Regions:
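N-terminal leader/propeptide and maturation segments of large enzyme subunits in energy/redox metabolism
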Residues: 123-195
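Regulatory sensory and allosteric helical modules in signal-transduction proteins
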Residues: 26-30, 42-66
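Short, basic/aromatic recognition patches
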Residues: 1-13, 49-53, 63-70
């Protein structure tokens, strides 16, 4: 993520998190920085699963930032990618990063005169931005027509790329050790957190 993003907010201030979630959206791993961002990802992942139930496919990618559906602030835009192995949804990779602008009445999203959330930034409820590996250009255009800075498009592509790297690395593990071993270790992790 840090090697592909262009914004100093992400690559220098490190105002982002990454995470790995099981097929149900339960947290398996997350970066240590900014727990407020990281801990908001699991509930959003579950929200996306529910919202798109029956319409989640290999190659899909979702965007989300909506404070009314579990987001923490509109400038923190999350990307989720489902991971399929042998036709089964086994995990999700996710990245959430603070974007320099995501629309709204003033540049940067910090509007001290705002009296409602619509004046702060563009609200992005759970939306499928890539459908089965094909970018939904119409949705992309709608979002970024409302954003002042071109750099945000590059940073969102960096978030998408980081999710793809996470997917690729998890699939390497699954091919090497198998889904049964993954499930055993996943369950051991959940049991350890209960103690």
């Amino acid at each position: 993520m840090e090697q592909t993003t262009r914004s100093p907010i992400l690559c220098e201030a490190k105002d982002y998190v990454t995470g790995l979630y099981d097929g149900e959206g339960r947290m398996l791993e997350q970066t240590e920085n900014l727990p407020i961002l990281a801990f908001s990802l699991a509930p959003v992942c579950k929200h996306i699963r529910k919202t798109f139930e029956g319409d989640i496919h290999e190659g899909d990618v979702f965007f989300h930032n909506d404070v009314f559906s579990l987001g923490n602030q509109n400038n923190d835009v999350a990307v989720f990618k489902p991971v399929f192995f042998e036709g089964e949804l086994v995990a999700w990779t996710a990245v959430k990063g603070h974007q320099a602008d995501i629309g709204g009445a003033v540049a940067g999203g910090y509007n001290p005169n705002a009296v409602e959330v619509w004046q702060e930034a563009l609200r992005i409820p759970a939306v499928k931005i890539v459908d089965r590996g094909k970018l939904r250009q119409d949705v992309w255009n709608l979002i970024f027509a409302n954003v002042r800075l071109d750099i945000v498009q590059h940073d969102m592509k960096a978030e998408m790329g980081a999710c793809a790297v996470g997917e690729r690395r998890l699939l390497e593990v699954l091919r090497k050790y198998g889904v049964a071993s993954y499930n055993v270790h996943k369950q051991a992790l959940f049991e350890a957190t209960r103690r």
